[in-house]
């Protein structure tokens, strides 16, 4: 009887481990390029967690609020565009993201919005005017030749994330 009980317990443990292994990878997207916009932490963020970042090319370092200003669920499209000063990324936001960006651009004038891709800072823009249309432009500190692939990777990640929410 004791051998049967031990066998039953071992069998139950094996089933639990096999089920937990199945859930471990659920929701994980391999090779993800997750874009998020973070606001520079410049006083007044008392209880907010501040994370130090260092820009890849300039070496400029400062703190950003750990909670994203705009997350991957609020970004609807990303384009690589040519503007007067060179190549830039254009982010189109949904209504919730546009509203948050507008509020931040009004109340945090002079602060930077940092583009983080999978947790790594790649670009920043100073909030110099209110952004009312939900379209955010930023330059990066990456070489122009890397931008096209970055945009493709971010779009692919967004498509996979958004398709899982439907």
Predicted ranges, named:
Residues 1-20:
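Sec-dependent bacterial lipoprotein signal peptides
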Residues 2, 22-166:
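Structural signature of multi-pass, alpha-helical inner-membrane proteins
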């Amino acid at each position: 009887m004791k051998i049967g009980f031990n066998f039953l317990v071992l069998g139950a443990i094996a089933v639990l481990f096999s089920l937990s292994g199945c859930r471990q990878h659920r929701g994980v997207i391999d090779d993800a390029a997750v874009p998020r916009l973070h606001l520079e932490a410049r006083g007044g963020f008392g209880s907010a967690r501040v994370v130090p970042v260092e820009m890849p090319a300039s070496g400029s370092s400062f703190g950003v609020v750990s909670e994203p200003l705009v997350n991957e669920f609020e970004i609807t499209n990303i384009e690589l565009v040519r503007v007067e000063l060179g190549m830039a990324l254009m982010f189109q936001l949904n209504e919730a993201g546009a509203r948050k960006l507008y509020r931040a651009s009004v109340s945090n004038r002079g602060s930077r919005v940092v583009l983080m891709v999978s947790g790594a800072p790649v670009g920043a823009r100073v909030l110099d005017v209110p952004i009312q249309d939900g379209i955010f432009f930023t330059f990066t500190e990456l070489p122009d030749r890397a931008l096209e692939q970055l945009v493709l990777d971010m779009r692919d990640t967004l498509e996979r994330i958004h398709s899982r929410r439907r």
